[in-house]
Design a protein with these regions (language model features):
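Extracytoplasmic gate region of multi-pass secondary transporters
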Residues: 95-96, 308-373, 427, 460
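C-terminal ends and interior cores of transmembrane alpha-helices
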Residues: 152-165, 178, 390-403
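Helix-breaking motifs and short loop linkers at transmembrane-helix boundaries and internal kinks
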Residues: 106-107, 132, 141-142, 163-169, ...
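Conserved MFS/SLC helix-loop-helix module at the cytosolic interface between two early adjacent transmembrane helices
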Residues: 128-169
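Glycine-rich segments within core transmembrane alpha-helices of 12-TM secondary carriers
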Residues: 208-242, 249-256, 445-459
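Central cavity-lining transmembrane alpha-helices of secondary-active solute carriers
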Residues: 119-135, 358-370
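Extracellular/periplasmic helix-loop-helix junction of adjacent transmembrane segments
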Residues: 95-128
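Intracellular terminal tails of multi-pass secondary transporters
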Residues: 1-86, 92, 100, 264-299, ...
Length: 529
């Protein structure tokens, strides 16, 4: 044991000797480093280019990167956007169904808040399954099979909503819908992190825009689900003896099931388990990940149990700060679950109301991409979250302060972009802040997303009809949760700035990719602030 320690100290001393003189400071010694064995192991498996890539000329590697980028982009992006459009529509079409007569047909008791309970119960199932689902996928590494299967099941459940005849049936269907849909969002965020980093020119720095691409599915569905719902509501009510709300669930559920069949052979897996990549392309994909974070994630994930990642995530204080940040944003964004009902308070017919829900989402798509693009271009995260939150808070205050039509619709136009612009960049900030190991990253993403969506459980009861048109309680709570996010973002930025200063000095930082002491500055890893 003593000889092993001696050899390790010699290795570190050699590394230190190479680094002394670069900045005039002596790096941290091996005795100052926690978990030295793990650190040395990471360094031993670090930046070593695979032989299959080392023999390529620069021109050949550029050609290989171009081919890899095209393969992944053409297979991945269109399908995940389409899947998320359908995921979001199937989850939130109950808001449009309310305008189409669902509460009346099922004899829901407004005094008992039965409709609100039907909305909130989905997020109970969503919360319970989020972490197990994503840790399971991180272990098996087969999203190309797992996700389409989940999609097929949630499409069937969504279509089955048309058959419910009472409150109990609606509750059961909504619970299981949330249970199955929990697999989707964070899972695809993990796939993005693995696959898109392989093809991006600046890896982690571009994660904000790629996250915006993923989340554009939700925004597009918000923009066009109103149009679809308006068409069904106006033209299919009473067709074949079914109400408009029943056709809404049937049509959208059948489309989801149909798309899931195509997803089975279109979707990719993680880099090492993607069958339609050549051996050279797999090696390059994994190497791009190693270049970005300093080591091979797969080695970590192969040796970690499903719950090891959860333990690591819970032990990191940054996970909890990120949790409060995302919880505040998602809680304020719960207004989108009832957006048709909120817009209905402007006094227009059901069809016009559904059409009026579209412009805020169109604006959201545009502003979210601009904000995410600029966040990636500058490498900055904090202000790209704070400024949209200021806009959202102002919109909520305006909505609660007046009953005038024009100012209230302006508030509705601004509250959705403000929340989503901040949300997309905050999601990217999670992966930027918790880059490794992969099991920890998976657990953190799932845990944060699950708990933050739990806010929708109580938020459902703040948008009852009796609270219209200003929804003062809801708008006030939204302002409070936005303030919570602002404080959390400020605390996180302060923490990351301090950690980056340590990295500048070559000091070991747990969770960062330092290799051996004194080499962090050379490899260039920094937490995004």
């Amino acid at each position: 044991m003593a000889s092993e320690k001696s050899d390790l100290e010699k290795a570190v001393s050699t590394e230190e000797a190479a680094d002394i003189g670069k900045d005039g400071e002596k790096p941290t010694t091996v005795k100052d480093i926690p978990n030295v064995a793990d650190l040395t192991q990471a360094n031993m498996r670090g930046l070593r280019m695979p032989e299959i890539l080392a023999r390529l000329t620069p021109e050949q590697r550029l050609e290989l990167e171009t081919r890899l980028r095209r393969k992944i982009d053409w297979r991945l992006l269109p399908m995940i956007i389409l899947m998320y459009i359908l995921n979001y529509i199937d989850r939130n079409n109950i808001a449009a169904a309310k305008l189409a007569g669902l509460p009346e047909d099922l004899n829901l008791d407004p005094n008992a808040s039965e409709f609100q309970t039907a909305v909130s119960i989905l997020f109970v199932g969503y919360l319970l399954m989020q972490i197990p689902s994503n840790l399971f996928l991180n272990k098996i590494g087969k999203p190309a099979i797992y996700l389409p299967a989940c999609m097929m099941v949630w499409g069937v459940i969504s279509a089955a909503t048309a058959a419910v005849t009472n409150f109990g049936g609606l509750i059961a269907v909504r619970f299981f819908l949330g249970f199955v849909e929990a697999a989707y969002f964070v899972t695809w965020l993990l796939v993005l992190l693995e696959l898109l980093v392989c093809v991006m020119m600046n890896t982690r720095k571009e994660l904000g825009l790629r996250t915006a691409l993923l989340y554009s599915g939700a925004l597009i569905s918000g923009a066009f689900s109103g149009l679809i719902s308006a068409g069904i509501t106006q033209n299919m009510d009473g067709a074949r003896g079914l109400g408009a709300w029943q056709w809404l669930f049937i049509i959208e559920g059948v489309i989801t099931v149909g798309v899931s069949f195509f997803a089975f052979w279109i979707l990719p897996n993680f880099p090492r388990t993607t069958s339609w990549l050549s051996e050279e392309e797999k090696a390059l994909a994994v190497w791009r990940l190693e270049e970005d974070i300093g080591e091979d994630d797969w080695i970590d994930s192969e040796h970690q149990s499903l719950w090891t990642g959860a333990r690591l995530a819970f032990a990191d204080v940054k996970t909890w700060v990120l949790l409060f940040l995302l919880f505040g944003i998602v809680a304020s964004g719960s207004v989108t679950n009832f957006f048709p009902a909120v817009v209905k308070t402007l006094g227009y017919s059901n069809v016009i109301t559904l059409l009026l829900t579209c412009p805020p989402y169109v604006l959201t798509v545009i502003t979210t991409f601009i904000n995410a693009w600029h966040a990636d271009r500058t490498g900055e995260r904090f202000w790209h979250i704070m400024l949209p939150l200021v806009v959202a808070m102002a919109a909520f205050i305006l909505a609660a302060a007046t009953t005038s039509l024009a100012p209230r619709y302006v508030a509705m136009m601004l509250m959705v972009p403000g929340v989503y612009c901040a949300f997309v960049v905050a999601l990217a900030w999670i992966s930027n802040t918790l880059p490794r190991p992969p099991a920890k990253r998976a657990a953190a993403l799932a845990f944060i997303n699950a708990v933050s969506n739990a806010s929708s459980i109580y938020a459902s009861y703040m948008y009852e009809d009796r609270m219209a048109p200003r929804y003062v309680i809801a708008m006030s709570v939204n302002c409070g949760t936005i303030f919570l996010s602002m404080v959390s973002a400020t605390v996180l930025r302060f923490m990351l700035v301090r950690l980056n200063k340590k990295l500048d000095q070559g000091i070991y930082v747990k969770g960062a990719i330092n290799a051996l002491p004194g080499t962090a500055a050379e490899h260039g890893f920094r937490f995004k602030v």
